[in-house]
């Protein structure tokens, strides 16, 4: 009986330790975030304001929210060069913190950028290096008929410089309201 009780205690202890270890690992990877995709199908629709309302109604569950609107149909252009594989997202001032992005240069998007529909953006490292020789802050990038002033450059996310086109380092983030 004593051996059986000890075995159960050891098994429960190992299980609890493994659970904590897995939670810590997931938290370090940023998996304490939730992504909700809203598609234009069906009779129900949602807006960015709905997302903010849900966060206000559930402050104990949601610490921060940010919309991520896919604008990738707008192919970025710098001079005569088109960046066909770049992703373009409309986000708010919380997005960089939620994704654990750090800045290499400049600043993140700010509340006033969103409120005032400013034509500014933050770019990934790949675009900064290939389009601007590492000096993108203050330059402009064209999306459709609009020009956006680059206010920040993200630190590299991908360690292999040969594998950067079409990934996190090849993104452009602009105010979702623009």
Give the predicted meaning of each segment.
Residues 4, 27-28, 142:
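Arginine/glycine-rich "motif VI" loop of SF2 helicases in the C-terminal RecA-like domain
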Residues 15-87, 94-97, 111-112, 129:
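Hydrophobic, regular-secondary-structure patches
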């Amino acid at each position: 009986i004593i051996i059986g009780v000890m075995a159960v205690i050891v098994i429960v202890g190992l299980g609890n330790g493994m659970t904590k270890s897995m939670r810590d690992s997931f938290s370090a990877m940023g998996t304490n975030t939730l992504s909700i995709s809203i598609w234009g199908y069906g009779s129900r629709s949602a807006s960015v304001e709905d997302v903010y309302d849900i966060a206000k109604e559930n402050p104990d569950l949601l610490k921060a929210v940010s919309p991520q609107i896919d604008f990738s149909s707008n192919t970025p252009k710098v001079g005569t060069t088109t960046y066909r594989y770049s992703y373009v997202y409309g986000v708010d001032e919380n997005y960089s913190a939620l994704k654990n992005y750090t800045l290499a240069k400049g600043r993140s998007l700010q509340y006033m950028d969103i409120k005032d529909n400013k034509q500014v953006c933050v770019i990934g490292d790949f675009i900064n290096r290939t389009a601007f020789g590492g000096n993108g802050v203050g330059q402009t990038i064209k999306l459709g008929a609009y020009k956006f002033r680059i206010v920040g450059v993200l630190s590299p996310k991908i360690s292999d410089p040969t594998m950067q086109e079409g990934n996190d380092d090849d993104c452009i983030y602009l105010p979702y309201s623009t």
